[in-house]
Amino acid sequence: MFANMVSKLTSLQQELLSALLDSGVTKDVLLQALEDLDPSPSAFGVKLDSLQMSPSGSKLSDTDSKPVFHTLTNGHSKGKLSGDEGSEDGDDYDTPPILKELQSQNTEEAAEQRAEIERMLAEDPWRAARMIKGYMQQHNIPQREVVDVTGLNQSHLSQHLNKGTPMKTQKRAALYTWYVRKQREILRQFNQATQGSGATMLDKGNQDQVLLFFSEFSQSGQGMVQPGDDAAIEPACKKLRRNRFKWGPASQQILYQAYERQKNPSKEEREALVEECNRAECLQRGVSPSKAHGLGSNLVTEVRVYNWFANRRKEEAFRQKLAMDAYSGPAHSLNSLLSHSSPHHPQTSSSPPSKMQGVRYSQQGPGEVTSSTTINHHSSNAMSTSQSVLQQVSPGALDPSHSLLSPDAKMISVSGGGLPPVSTLTNIHASHHVHQQTPNLIMPLSGVMAIAQSLNTSQAQTVPVINSVAGSLAALQPVQFSQQLNSQHQQLMQQSSGHMSQQSFMASVSHSHMYPHKQEPPQYSHSSRFPPAMVVTDANSLSTLSSMSSSKQCPLQAW
């Protein structure tokens, strides 16, 4: 007898029996322990046989299935059955009310349900889990509903359905009980929708099932009422929540296709979509479209279609806003980064010239242009610091006869490479600025000397001078210009060409205001006479300028 029983056990159960025998327990003692555990050995054998039967092997009768439910409902589930191996849910699990209710019923329908549950318990747990999961997806049933009815842990239920995580037999029995009753309840809904007018679903024949699975209690302390069954036991569990409507994959496909055609359909179009969606939902469940009212809470209505389209339009508008923010964000952040990282920050024209740190110059007028600064870094062995070349635009109002950029006014070349020509340093674009700025010009020292020689002493001019020491701004002292500018011009240029080949080129922007013994800001008598000029020089040449004596005092201020 024992040998025949071993042949019907699973591999794990055989290992457990072998371990018991290896521990010193004899067969007689083990058989006596089994008889003491269950006074009906034949009933115990039936349970083991039922666990190994194939789904089509045989159908258990009501009398054969009662001992199993008797064991499950009376807490004798400590001895593991098939599917209990390695259960990760170690919490104690009281007998769920759904099992107690099914055990207490003596109707023919309850007997059929118990037989179906026994058959599922005998199957492979993973196969049964996949079957239940597919049924839930087909009918858009959330896991929360199963948790509310069976009392299972939702995490454990999800792992069992998705990954086949082992689950105790008592818990699987509760899950299978819900599955069997849910199948019958949905089938009853569709059948009654065909027989009746389909307008109402809460008739007295199926009110108990609807209250069980689609309960909408208004009172928190009220239990589930089943008027048609006097022997039913009221489950003392928490209040069941109403099922939330969930769009099925078939309906979503139809709605998305309609959204591509029309984002805001009319009422007639929405009603046509309702019929199409309900038809697809019925076909998904394997029932006739004429039974659409049997969908229950999953029935598609015109209001739900309207809300779906409204939500899609909101989502699309939100995505467009995010895309616009992402597009304009980098440009804004780049401008902010350049304005903070650059040593020169643009300011309005209301600031005094000595404190202006702007690198963009503009002026009003139809024929005037502006330029934005381009900073070019030239590294060389003979240059210890980077060179910052500030570009300014020659104004259109400047008289062409001055010939400031003549061949004799070339940029001073240094060892390791010369500066790029003025044409490559100048970026001319249209002026759209509101404030007015004095036009500026890049020119070498020779050009400044040539113009300064021909200036009238009664006219006040502005000459910005570039000078820098080790890449940092320095405040410059006032420079005295000699009246014999023409005589010292050639000497200055000869000295500057020699020093530039030995010393590093140092450049910054400074303003040199020339005015006849007055502290007021200079005023131009005519803007076309001489606009501000840019002087490019080195330290020794600047010292030569400072040594000149003249009645024109030119204080240099760091820009």
Swiss-Prot record:
It is found in: Nucleus. Residues 334-354, 370-381 have a biased composition (Low complexity). SMART domains: HOX. Pfam families: HNF-1_N, HNF-1B_C. The keyword Transcription applies. Keywords: Activator, Developmental protein, DNA-binding, Homeobox, Nucleus, Transcription, Transcription regulation. GO terms for cellular component: nucleus. GO terms for molecular function: DNA binding; DNA-binding transcription factor activity; DNA-binding transcription factor activity, RNA polymerase II-specific; protein dimerization activity; RNA polymerase II cis-regulatory region sequence-specific DNA binding. Residues 1-35 are annotated as: Dimerization. Belongs to the HNF1 homeobox family. This is Hepatocyte nuclear factor 1-beta-A. The lineage of its organism: Eukaryota, Metazoa, Chordata, Craniata, Vertebrata.
